[in-house]
Amino acid sequence: MSLPKDLLYTEEHEWVKADDGSYVIGITDFAQDQLGDIVFVELPEVGDTVTKGDSIGSIESVKTVSDFYAPVTGKVVAVNETLEDEPELINSNPYDTGWILKLEEVEEADVKALLSSDDYEKVLD
């Protein structure tokens, strides 16, 4: 299982990457593996303000439907529209082309509360 060291993580298996003033968010390799083949992704709307811990969309796989939670509070400035036609990108490349959304105006305290890759690895053990 792949676990990039330059990302931050949540115990709910989301990842967060700082990207020049904004934050890109997706689900981890562990999460996509647990879900199985992803067939549909419900995304939030650009312009929405999301609150840490709130459900902001869902991911449907052949096994189940799971809510996707905001790992930090912020404003949605982009969603990965490619996932509408190719949701399986989350399975094949969860940390790159399978990203889900991008936030700005993020609460710094929320970012500081995220887990390092080493701490997230302990959650998985």
UniProtKB/Swiss-Prot annotation:
The keyword 4Fe-4S does not apply. It holds the Pfam family GCV_H. GO terms for biological process: glycine decarboxylation via glycine cleavage system. Its cofactor is (R)-lipoate. Residues 22-104 form the Lipoyl-binding domain. Keywords: Lipoyl. GO terms for cellular component: cytosol; glycine cleavage complex. InterPro entries: 2-oxoA_DH_lipoyl-BS (IPR003016), Biotin_lipoyl (IPR000089), GCV_H (IPR002930), GCV_H/Fam206 (IPR033753), GCV_H_sub (IPR017453), Single_hybrid_motif (IPR011053). The modification N6-lipoyllysine is found at residue 63. The glycine cleavage system catalyzes the degradation of glycine. The H protein shuttles the methylamine group of glycine from the P protein to the T protein. Belongs to the GcvH family. The glycine cleavage system is composed of four proteins: P, T, L and H. PANTHER family: GLYCINE CLEAVAGE SYSTEM H PROTEIN, GLYCINE CLEAVAGE SYSTEM H PROTEIN-RELATED. This is Glycine cleavage system H protein.
